[in-house]
């Protein structure tokens, strides 16, 4: 209900008018200092009011990992097993799954009697396969933690790929995550547990979801879709006591990383600069350590955290008192950086005319036509 201003008590009216007058007389510097001070105090109040996060304890819990036969998924499987989890790894290739399970059980003793690690072979780009993984027949008890790690990057220029290759990239990176997480979260929601023990769904996207890079066009688009999935599911899962975590790794050593480097355009290497890839094991340790601290938007290096500040959106912040001012700075700096990148790209294609000439003639690339 809205009251006419004449009905507001005189003292209140006088106070409001005084406040407006004070704002009008305040200098721009003083005004923005006041606003910034208010925001800082408000953020500190939110931090103090936030309940203390519980440590993620997976001993005796069921952890299901897609892409668990190699790369970060395999490293997470080994790490979780050493922490006492009952691990299930999921991938398509049975031979790789068997080798990974054998490697882990040979290398590590069980943390407790009866601890298990097993595999399920499934093509997660198919909805029915993802549903089978989490069915009661395949998995009698629901998972406590899910890691969605499956994915692959195929480098090159978008115009050089056939439509079938573009669709394959989206299927490999987005649909596999969507179907796997949808089936797993649905199973979790069906069988709720105590609010004191939240379940976890950690979904791997990429730092390139924040800042697309020439030569990774189709990969960036699919990983940006995964980032939107993370933000959407994070809110939808709240009523079921499921904590959704987004993981945005930079480069890490894996079979996939070696493959993507084989077709990476030279201009992409120039823009990237010297980027040291961490090991898959180090990536897994960083991700798990951040989850233990309650992190919901996890990056694996400083560059990733900086790039995240360009695309904060409605996602949870990481070290927000530092990240918000950084975001303001990056809004100013990014156009300058883009100007230098665009200059380098024009110089590259001026010197390498085959790509432009081919497409001006209406040619569509072969399986890997991108100039090196």
Swiss-Prot record:
Gene3D superfamilies linked: NAD(P)-binding Rossmann-like Domain
GXSXG (motif): residue ranges: 67-71
Record's GO cellular component terms: endoplasmic reticulum membrane
Pfam families according to UniProt: adh_short
UniProt entry tagged with the keyword Transmembrane helix: yes
Pathway this chain belongs to: Lipid metabolism; sphingolipid metabolism
Keywords of this entry: Endoplasmic reticulum, Lipid metabolism, Membrane, NADP, Nucleotide-binding, Oxidoreductase, Sphingolipid metabolism, Transmembrane, Transmembrane helix
Annotated localization: Endoplasmic reticulum membrane
Reaction(s) catalysed by this chain's protein: sphinganine + NADP(+) = 3-oxosphinganine + NADPH + H(+)
GO BP annotations listed: 3-keto-sphinganine metabolic process; sphingolipid biosynthetic process
Main subcellular location of this protein, as a coarse class: endoplasmic reticulum
Active site: 205 (proton donor), 219 (proton acceptor), 223 (lowers pka of active site tyr)
CDD domains, alphabetized: KDSR-like_SDR_c
GO MF entry, a single one: NADPH binding
Root EC class: oxidoreductase
Transmembrane segments: 321-341
Membrane topology, from the record: Single-pass membrane protein
The keyword Endoplasmic reticulum appears for this protein: yes
Residue numbers binding NADPH: 67, 69, 71, 92, 96, 123-124
Binding site for NADP(+): 64, 123, 219, 223, 254
Protein family per UniProt: Belongs to the short-chain dehydrogenases/reductases (SDR) family.
Role, per record: Catalyzes the reduction of 3'-oxosphinganine (3-ketodihydrosphingosine/KDS) to sphinganine (dihydrosphingosine/DHS), the second step of de novo sphingolipid biosynthesis.
The name this protein goes by in its record: 3-ketodihydrosphingosine reductase TSC10
Provenance organism: Yarrowia lipolytica (strain CLIB 122 / E 150) (Yeast)
Encoding gene (name): TSC10
């Amino acid at each position: 209900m809205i009251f006419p201003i004449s009905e507001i008590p005189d003292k209140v009216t006088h106070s409001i008018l005084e406040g407006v007058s004070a704002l009008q007389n305040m200098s721009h510097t003083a005004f923005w200092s006041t606003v910034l001070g208010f925001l800082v105090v408000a953020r500190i109040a939110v931090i103090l009011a936030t309940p203390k996060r519980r440590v993620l304890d997976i001993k005796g819990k069921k952890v299901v990992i897609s892409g668990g036969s190699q790369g970060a998924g395999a490293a997470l499987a080994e790490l979780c097993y050493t922490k006492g989890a009952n691990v299930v790894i999921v991938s398509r290739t049975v031979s790789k799954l068997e080798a990974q399970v054998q490697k882990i059980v040979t290398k590590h003793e069980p943390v407790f009697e009866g601890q298990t690690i097993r595999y399920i072979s499934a093509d997660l780009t198919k909805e029915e396969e993802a549903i089978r993984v989490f069915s009661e027949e395949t998995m009698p008890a629901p998972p406590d933690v899910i890691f969605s790690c499956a994915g692959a990057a195929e480098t090159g220029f978008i115009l050089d790929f056939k439509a079938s290759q573009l669709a394959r990239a989206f299927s490999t990176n987005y649909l596999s995550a969507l179907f796997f997480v949808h089936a797993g979260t649905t199973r979790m929601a069906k069988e709720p547990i105590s609010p004191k023990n939240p379940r976890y769904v950690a979904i791997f996207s990429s730092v390139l979801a924040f800042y697309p890079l020439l030569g990774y066009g189709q990969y960036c688009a699919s990983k940006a879709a995964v980032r939107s999935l993370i933000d959407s599911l994070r809110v939808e899962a709240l009523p079921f006591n499921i904590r959704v975590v987004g993981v945005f790794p930079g480069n890490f050593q894996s079979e996939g990383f070696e493959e993507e480097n084989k077709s990476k355009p030279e201009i992409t290497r120039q823009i990237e600069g010297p980027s040291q890839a961490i090991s898959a094991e180090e990536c897994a340790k960083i991700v798990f350590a951040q989850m233990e601290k309650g992190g919901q938007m996890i990056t694996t290096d400083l560059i990733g955290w900086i790039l995240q500040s360009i695309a904060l959106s409605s996602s949870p912040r990481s070290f927000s008192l530092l990240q918000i001012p950084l975001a303001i700075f990056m809004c100013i700096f990014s156009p300058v950086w883009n100007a230098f990148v665009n200059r380098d790209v024009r110089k590259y294609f001026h010197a390498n005319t085959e790509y432009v000439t081919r497409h001006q003639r209406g040619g569509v690339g072969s399986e890997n036509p991108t100039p090196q």
